[in-house]
Curated annotation (Swiss-Prot):
GO term, biological process aspect, one: peptide biosynthetic process
Matches recorded under InterPro entries: Elong-fact-P_C, NA-bd_OB-fold, Rib_uL2_dom2, Transl_elong_fac_P/YeiP, Transl_elong_KOW-like, Transl_elong_p-like_YeiP, Transl_elong_P/YeiP_cen, Transl_elong_P/YeiP_CS
Matches recorded under SMART domains: EFP (SM01185), Elong-fact-P_C (SM00841)
Species of the source: Cronobacter sakazakii (strain ATCC BAA-894)
GO molecular function, one term: translation elongation factor activity
Annotated protein name in UniProt: Elongation factor P-like protein
Length: 190
């Protein structure tokens, strides 16, 4: 089992009975001699999506696990269940609407490329989306000419129903690229 100073972003830990994906690591070096370096790690709970923060000393032993990641395509909706199909062996993976509520906010009709399901020991854990998605603005205040010089923003409703802040010069009908985790406008879609 690795020490805390060997943990990298994207690894999965089994800690206090929870499966946690490492999202970010801050290294804090103490100024006093002999004091241990601290590793402040931010996690996302694989099962609940809840954000968790923990501190470890560099020589703390941590229990890492290996998740199986499979690329999937969205297949169909059956009542309250969303079915995804493995791209290689066509295994169906089923999630309830509650399990993937956050992901559905960014998933265009028909799905999107590079979606993955995470499994561990045969147990379905989570649906993972790519970092960005291209969506169309369906409703926002009209674009203001000459507003590109200002950094002001306005709310915009996207084709999936999610509302994010966009620059003032954008108008309805334009396709934009959105950073999913941060719910942030990144630029116009190509």
């Amino acid at each position: 089992m690795p020490r805390a100073n060997e943990i990298k972003k994207g690894m999965v830990l089994n800690y206090n009975g929870k499966l946690l994906i490492v999202k970010d690591i801050d290294i804090q070096s103490p100024s006093a001699r002999g004091a241990a370096t601290l590793y402040k790690m931010r996690f996302s709970d694989v099962r609940t999506g809840q954000k968790v923060e923990e501190r470890f000393k560099g020589d703390d032993i941590l229990d890492t696990i290996t998740l199986t990641r499979r690329f999937v395509d969205f297949s169909y909706v059956d009542g309250n269940e969303y079915v995804f199909m493995d791209k290689e062996d066509y295994t169906p993976y089923t999630f309830t609407k509650d399990q993937i509520e956050e992901e559905l906010l960014f998933m265009p009709e028909g799905g999107m490329p590079d979606m993955q399901v995470l499994t561990w020991d045969g147990q379905l854990l989570a649906l993972e989306l790519p970092q960005t998605v291209d969506l169309e603005i369906v409703e926002t205040a009209p674009g203001i000419k000459g507003a590109s010089a200002s950094a002001r923003s306005k709310p915009a409703t996207l084709s999936t129903g999610v509302v994010i802040q966009v620059p003032e010069y954008l108008s309805a009908g334009e396709k934009i690229r959105v950073h999913i985790a941060e719910r942030r406008y990144m630029g116009r879609a190509e």
